[in-house]
Amino acid sequence: MTQHSPYSSAIAEQRNQEWLRFVELLRQAYAEDLHLPLLQLMLTPDEREALGTRVRIIEELLRGEMSQRELKTELGAGIATITRGSNSLKSAPVELRHWLENVLLKSA
């Protein structure tokens, strides 16, 4: 059995706070129409490409017309990435899933 030290708990909390700080910064950037320059500053080209691929993975998983193996071939993503997307989608709140369906599938 793995013991969790207070140190690892403190680091996890710090990382969560840093994430929430970034989310708030991004929210403010959207409000001031500075979101694109902020994201270009914060993310490398590879990270931006990976996010785009993840959106496509979620979109195709919601559509349900391709197997995970077909998605791997179509998108050039690793099967582990697609499986993580599938598992995340399964555990996503119903409201988020409905919103994603509306945004990603009905606008396509």
Curated annotation (Swiss-Prot):
One of its GO terms (biological process) is negative regulation of DNA-templated transcription. Residues 68-91 bind DNA. The keyword Cytoplasm applies. Coiled coil: none annotated. One of its GO terms (cellular component) is cytoplasm. It comes from the Bacteria. Signal peptide: none annotated. Keywords: Cytoplasm, DNA-binding, Repressor, Transcription, Transcription regulation. The keyword Amino-acid biosynthesis does not apply. Homodimer. This protein is an aporepressor. When complexed with L-tryptophan it binds the operator region of the trp operon (5'-ACTAGT-'3') and prevents the initiation of transcription. The complex also regulates trp repressor biosynthesis by binding to its regulatory region. This is Trp operon repressor.
